[in-house]
Amino acid sequence: MALIFAVFFKKIVIDRQIEKLNDLEDEVEKAKLKAKEIVEEAERDAVSKAKEIELKAKEKAYQIKEEIEKEARNSKNEIAQKEARIIKKEEILDGKIEKIEIKSLELEKINDELEEKRKEIDDLRVKQEEELSRVSELTKADAREILLRKVREEMTHDMAITIREFENKLDEEKEKISQKILSTAIGKAAADYVADATVSVINLPNDEMKGRIIGREGRNIRTIEALTGVDVIIDDTPEAVVLSCFDGVKREVARLTIEKLITDGRIHPGKIEEIVNKCKKDIEKEIVAAGEEALIELSIPTMHPEIIKTLGRLKYRTSYGQNVLTHSIEVAKIASTMAAEIGANVELAKRGGLLHDIGKVLVNEIETSHAIVGGEFIKKFGEKQDVINAVMAHHNEVEFETVEAILVQAADAVSASRPGARRETLTAYIKRLENLEEIANSFEGVESSYAIQAGRELRIVINPDKVSDDEATLMSREVAKKIEDTMQYPGQIKVTILRETRAVEYAK
């Protein structure tokens, strides 16, 4: 029994050991599987990371490639631009070289021609010396003197022709330059302008106001006329009073006086005198303000107060219907612009242009030229000699001392002669046209004449059988001279001679 039990127990122990062995084998198998899985997973990770690294490397390589290609393109463009500039410069240089070569060839040709001419002259001189010595039996010295005299005469003739050609070219260039300067000056000095009249019209609230202005037995109107120096015209024109006076200051004082009397309602000699005195003071202030505004407009820094005051009075003065202050400002602008174009003193030209007609305010007090009076007036108040000369010389009454004085005269002519700047009365205008045509018709060979362009051009039709082309040129000068001697007119008048020759034949 005990043996059986021992055998049984041993078997049990052996079975358990076999089971443990089997369990160990299972665990080993599992460990092998686990190890295999770990190895496979590690291999997968390695492959994945390798692919990732490869992808990043490819991306980096692509970026580097793009940057290199971009830099290459930029470099290529820069090189292309530089090549284009170089090609353009080469073309310009080629063109200049070609011009230089052409000029060189021309110079060589001219030198060759001159050399040929010298040879011809030398040959001719030798022949003439021989001929003169042979024919007249003159000495060599006498023959040489005759030959030199003849050559000198021929050269003088050639020089005269050359000088005339250069003079014509110079005249053309001067014309172009002067047109450019004048067009620039007029363009910069363009200004609005309204022609002034010698009468003022005051509108009345009703016709009853006419009686109040006239006053009992005309005392009010006589007081106004006596205090202001203005003719007060009251006629059948409804609700209107006309003031007539060539002195713009007096006319403006009278206008303001009557307007204030109408507004106030009290119209009697005492009130009229009070308002006239007040209006005169107001006008004096406006005169000074007008002078100061002119200086500001032209950027002129300062002047003597008396000059400014006298300058302001030009606002109320006209010449051929043109406001003198407006004209003076325009002349200053044109003169300064022309001075800037030719490199002269701009400030001097501007100052002289503004003051050139200041003497027109003073000519009623002193019987002499307004240019001389104006020059002496500004000299009294410290203006420089160059400005004084510009004022006094603008009508050729004294000699020009500076180029700016000449510019002031030219600017004055431009401002006065431009279309629309000045006007005349209808009667004087018609009479001037008639006189122009009468002067033209007084010459022999004139068939008809027409004053056109508001009297600024005179066209004359002549008989071609009686007047030749050369005589027509001479006639135009004679007509212009006669107009200058016998007529007074603003600006200039163009004289045009028309000569037409017709040949007519009939086919039968």
UniProtKB/Swiss-Prot annotation:
Keywords: Endonuclease, Hydrolase, Nuclease, RNA-binding
Domain HD: from-to ranges: 324-417
GO cellular component terms, semicolon-separated: plasma membrane
UniProt keyword RNA-binding present: yes
EC code: 3.1.-.-
A Gene Ontology biological process term: mRNA catabolic process
Domain KH: 198-264
GO molecular-function term, one example from the UniProt record: RNA binding
Top-level division of the source organism's lineage: Bacteria
One Pfam family this sequence matches: HD
Chain's role: Endoribonuclease that initiates mRNA decay.
Family to which the UniProt record says this protein belongs: Belongs to the RNase Y family.
HAMAP family, per the entry: RNase_Y
Designated name of the protein: Ribonuclease Y
